[in-house]
Regions:
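Zn2+-dependent metallopeptidase catalytic domains
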Residues: 1-147
Length: 148
């Protein structure tokens, strides 16, 4: 199975459980982690102005894909437990956990979220977008980002 046909990388509709095999897991997760790391690296760089479109949107899009794919893997691991799937899950869980942990303690991103909330444009955002920003700040706090 190649990256183009991997059902874990098809976000056009509901998950294609019927096309899933344990061999899909590592290539898909590695691809999504690489994409997420690239987005994070780009967003860590200095920005003239932190905006929803240039900061939150790309981060949310990248991490949503990873979360969705990993959610499918976790769900299937819980309901269709096979030795092959368990091995794929156990192989990838440390990588996924490491990414989410590092993201939650990323001081550069934390500062950008704080800047976005402090900006005068924050009040003009939709309630849903303000909630996403507030939840991100809460998650950084719970992850220990503001302990240093």
């Amino acid at each position: 199975m190649n990256i183009q046909t991997n059902p874990l990388l098809d976000f056009s509709d509901l998950p294609r459980f019927d096309a899933f095999t344990p061999e899909c897991v590592t290539p898909a997760i590695d691809t999504l982690l690489a994409e997420c790391r690239d987005v994070v690296a780009r967003l860590e760089a200095p920005m003239d102005q932190v905006t929803w479109k240039d900061f939150v949107e790309p981060l949310e899009q990248a991490t949503e894909k990873l979360g969705r794919a990993w959610g499918v893997v976790g769900h299937l691991n819980a309901v269709v437990d096979t030795p092959e799937l368990r091995a794929a899950y156990n192989e990838n869980q440390p990588k996924v956990t490491e990414f989410w942990t590092a993201l939650g303690q990323n001081l550069a991103l934390f500062e950008k979220y704080k800047a976005l909330k402090a900006d005068a444009g924050y009040a003009a955002l939709t309630p849903q977008r303000r909630k996403i920003i507030d939840n991100a700040l809460r998650d950084f706090h719970l992850g220990g980002a503001d302990l240093s």
